[in-house]
Amino acid sequence: MADVSLKLSAKDIYEKDFEKTMARGYRREEVDAFLDDIITDYQKMADMNNEVVKLSEENNKLKKEVEELRLRVATSRPSDNKSFSSNNSSSSNNNVDILKRISNLEKAVFGK
């Protein structure tokens, strides 16, 4: 993610005092500069929020894929030794590939 340090806090915005000029107003340049800072901060927050939403959706997708692969592994296990011995090499290779994929997905999702 990009730089997430914000220049202003809610307290800074609330407590901001603008210097008054002799014409009973605020210096336009100071107000414009302050509003530019606010716009920059809010744009950063919007970008970060979009990134969080995107990552959350990707995380949910990967979790579903991990669960589907676990179910495939659980249902592909032979129920007795006879079928296991006849399909041992192909089933074993398939299960190893599935387990490797699950492991990689868990690392991606959970950071393990």
From Swiss-Prot:
Compositional bias (Low complexity): 81-95
Entry GO terms, CC: cytoplasm
InterPro entries documented for this protein: Cell_cycle_GpsB, DivIVA_domain, DivIVA_fam
Keyword Coiled coil found: yes
Coiled-coil region: 42-77
Pfam families per the UniProt record, alphabetical: DivIVA
GO BP term, example: cell division
Keyword tags: Cell cycle, Cell division, Cell shape, Coiled coil, Cytoplasm
Annotated stretches, region: Disordered: 75-97
Compartments (UniProt record): Cytoplasm
Job description of the protein: Divisome component that associates with the complex late in its assembly, after the Z-ring is formed, and is dependent on DivIC and PBP2B for its recruitment to the divisome. Together with EzrA, is a key component of the system that regulates PBP1 localization during cell cycle progression. Its main role could be the removal of PBP1 from the cell pole after pole maturation is completed. Also contributes to the recruitment of PBP1 to the division complex. Not essential for septum formation.
Alphabetized NCBIfam families for the sequence: DivI1A_domain, PRK14127.1
Protein family according to the UniProt entry: Belongs to the GpsB family.
Quaternary data: Forms polymers through the coiled coil domains. Interacts with PBP1, MreC and EzrA.
Protein name (Swiss-Prot/TrEMBL): Cell cycle protein GpsB
Organism: Staphylococcus haemolyticus (strain JCSC1435)
Gene symbol of the encoding locus: gpsB
